[in-house]
Amino acid sequence: MSMTDPIADFLTRVRNANLARHEVVEAPASKIKKSIAEILKAEGFIRDFEYIDDNKQGVIRVFLKYGEDRNRVITGIQRISKPGLRKYAKAEELPKVLNGLGIAIISTSAGVITDKEARSKQVGGEVIAYVW
């Protein structure tokens, strides 16, 4: 059976593993999931990730990050644009997550980037998710 929203599945796997305080989570890979993982790593929400080629779709392995006393670095992840209801924003209308404490992940013509990068490049796009 095919999956309706693979991005939501990936974000849910990361959220659930984070809540259960797992060190590693695996999900089926895709280019957009790899881009999302790169953003999460660059913004300091995860330790690292790796792509594992299994001669099929591939697997993306995400290494979660925790603070002192195993406090969660990712407080929340929310999928915004869904297959049944896409959400787009112009460059000047891009949302700020928790007044700049979180990030919005945006799919633009310049690739998958954060809301801060999209504002500086003056590009809008599809608002994939919020992470805080």
Swiss-Prot record:
GO terms for cellular component: ribonucleoprotein complex; ribosome. PROSITE patterns: RIBOSOMAL_S8. GO terms for molecular function: rRNA binding; structural constituent of ribosome. InterPro entries: Ribosomal_uS8, Ribosomal_uS8_CS, Ribosomal_uS8_sf. It comes from the Bacteria. The keyword RNA-binding applies. Keywords: Ribonucleoprotein, Ribosomal protein, RNA-binding, rRNA-binding. The keyword Transmembrane helix does not apply. GO terms for biological process: translation. SUPFAM superfamilies: Ribosomal protein S8. One of the primary rRNA binding proteins, it binds directly to 16S rRNA central domain where it helps coordinate assembly of the platform of the 30S subunit. Belongs to the universal ribosomal protein uS8 family. Part of the 30S ribosomal subunit. Contacts proteins S5 and S12. This is Small ribosomal subunit protein uS8. It comes from Leuconostoc mesenteroides subsp. mesenteroides (strain ATCC 8293 / DSM 20343 / BCRC 11652 / CCM 1803 / JCM 6124 / NCDO 523 / NBRC 100496 / NCIMB 8023 / NCTC 12954 / NRRL B-1118 / 37Y).
